[in-house]
Amino acid sequence: SYARITFWNQKGEVLLQEISTGGALALKARHFKPILGGDHALNVTFEANDDERLYGMGQYQQEYLDLKHCSLELAHRNSQASVPFVMSSLGYGFLWHNPSIGEVHFGKNRTTWQARSTKQMDYFITAGDTPAQISLAYAKATGFAPMMPEYGLGFWQCKLRYWNQEQLLSVAREYKQRNLPIDVIVCDFFHWPKMGDFRFDPEFFPDPQAMVDELKSM
């Protein structure tokens, strides 16, 4: 039989607990299913708490701040940045430390984390009295984000997209002529010759260094 993993805080209160693996249903809190290639598909399932609120998980195209009852894909997409760290109103933070594509389901009756292809179960949990304490413990485990440079806090000019060097510079020159402050101008995709060839296309951007020098002089 499986041991049931339970996490408590310093007050003896249960923060998170795996589902029971006993009974006629023969459920497994940690379920490994062999797949082709030698890896496993993995499900890890915990009991849910009706009074719990869940926050975090990065950037998704959805309207909910409280993630309770939400299902999220654990994968990056255009405008979707999956950061598999969730902070609970019960006073803990949970990091799913697994690079595999998967899903998480914060259901009403249980919470399930899924990895489609993995070699092992790996997650990190921390507790704290405040969100700041939990965030600090998370940062100490994963690394602190660098301070954003000052120019990154100003106005960004971005569009989809500038098709050549002269078009980009003409927009920047217009800002300068109108005395409008601008800190960043984004040269978005397809400035390269072919996908995966990350350099300026010389036909449309004949002198990138001169372009950068002029932008810096503004």
Where are these regions (language model features)?
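Aromatic-lined carbohydrate-binding/catalytic grooves of carbohydrate-active enzymes
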Residues: 146-218
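Catalytic and substrate-binding clefts that recognize carbohydrates or anionic sugar/phosphate headgroups
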Residues: 1-149, 159-160, 165, 172-177
